[in-house]
A protein has these predicted regions:
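Eukaryote-biased feature marking scaffold/signaling PDZ-domain proteins and nuclear chromatin regulators
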Residues: 11, 56-58, 72, 79, ...
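Short secondary-structure capping micro-motifs at structural edges
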Residues: 2-4, 44-49, 69-72, 98-102, ...
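Acidic, metal/cofactor-coordinating or nucleic-acid-engaging core segments within structured domains
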Residues: 68-105
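Conserved catalytic cores of phosphodiester-cleaving nucleases, focusing on short active-site segments
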Residues: 16, 57-68, 83-84, 88
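Short coil/turn segments at secondary-structure boundaries
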Residues: 29-32, 76-80, 126-129
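Eukaryotic short linear interaction motifs
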Residues: 23-27, 67-75, 121-123, 131-133
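Charge-rich, low-complexity intrinsically disordered linkers/tails
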Residues: 1-57, 66, 151-195
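Structured partner-binding subdomains within large eukaryotic complex subunits
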Residues: 101-195
């Protein structure tokens, strides 16, 4: 997430992440976002961009193994996912704050994460609690399980969940983001004239 305004010193680098391509937005929407993105090619930072090709990420996955990380492998993956998805949730909150609609995203799940190792999976939903100008970020555990139990009975559970995020949740989330972008004023100019 090398174009995202950092939360702390280290920028997240999830094993896998999903967001929206630049081309997912109309030319008019990209123009409205442009003042808040800057020149992404030269490395300007933005709340709305994770990388130069991904806007508004909504899913990350981290894979860790006990061999490399010890018994705390999943905890490490959870922390990395929490960092990545805090930036993702913050992006949506800041967009909605710009158009005075932040109440619509208060306490709503705005991103998901999957942490796993060679036998266990943890799935979380990430959301913000907005109290005036203060925003706090949280995660809600959706499911934790061992996919090797019961002769692999749960081996497709994460796939089915992720497919549901793509097919059901994501289109609604995208429409919500687009509706906020459409309310941004056109042709904002942040240039400061010389004295």
């Amino acid at each position: 997430m090398n174009n995202s305004i950092p939360l702390v010193g280290t920028r997240p680098q999830p094993d896998y992440s999903v967001g929206f391509k630049r081309e997912a937005f109309t030319e008019e929407q990209r123009e409205k976002l442009a003042p808040f993105i800057g020149d992404f090619i030269t490395g300007d930072w933005s709340y709305f961009m994770a990388t130069h090709y991904m806007y508004f990420p909504f899913l990350t996955c981290e894979v860790k193994c006990e061999v490399m990380c010890g018994a705390a492998a999943l905890d490490i993956a959870d922390r990395k996912n929490a960092h990545s998805m805090t930036l993702a949730v913050r992006a949506v909150v800041e967009l909605f704050r710009l158009v005075k609609r932040e109440k619509e995203v208060n306490r709503e799940i705005l991103a998901f994460s999957v942490s796993h190792d060679h036998r266990s999976v943890r799935i979380y939903g990430h959301y913000a609690v907005i109290d005036g100008s203060k925003t706090s970020f949280y995660r809600h555990p959706i499911r934790a399980f061992e996919f090797t139990d019961l002769d692999g009975k749960e081996k497709w559970t994460t796939y089915k969940f992720t497919k549901s995020v793509y097919d059901t949740w994501m289109p609604t989330h995208f429409k919500r983001i687009c509706s906020a972008i459409n309310e941004l004023p056109s042709k904002i100019n942040f240039d400061v004239s010389p004295l």
